[in-house]
Amino acid sequence: MADTGEVQFMKPFISEKSSKSLEIPLGFNEYFPAPFPITVDLLDYSGRSWTVRMKKRGEKVFLTVGWENFVKDNNLEDGKYLQFIYDRDRTFYVIIYGHNMCSEYRDFPQVAVEVDDYENGEEEEDGDDQDKHQ
């Protein structure tokens, strides 16, 4: 019976080699399904997603088109490490580790939500307002 669990690898980010594309370790190729996927999704801890094209060059596999967006959006710089957890269904969950080797979590803009001060959607009667309208 085939193993269907997650598999993973880590890569250091080296801008000279990894800004435009990222080479996936050769030993990882056995985990890709046939037919070979044209694209994969990269997901971060917050659920943000990037669709990235995969390209084979001989035995080597690279993340190409779309990878630059991931690099830019995550402010990747030399010395950070990336952990890729593959679900074997075209999705990599990516954890970014900083220079201190601790995982990085970024704050993203929050949408302001207006909270209704009234219960059950009905306005409360205010004695002062009643006096003004009488």
Swiss-Prot record:
Predominant location category: nucleus
Keyword annotations: DNA-binding, Nucleus, Transcription, Transcription regulation
Keyword presence, Transcription: yes
PROSITE patterns: B3
Disulfide bond residue pairs: none
UniProt miscellaneous comment: Putative DNA-binding elements conserved in B3 domains from the RAV, ARF and ABI3/VP1 subfamilies are largely absent in At1g16640, suggesting that B3 domains could function in contexts other than transcriptional regulation.
Stated name of the protein: B3 domain-containing protein At1g16640
Origin species: Arabidopsis thaliana (Mouse-ear cress)
Taxonomic path: Eukaryota, Viridiplantae, Streptophyta, Embryophyta, Tracheophyta
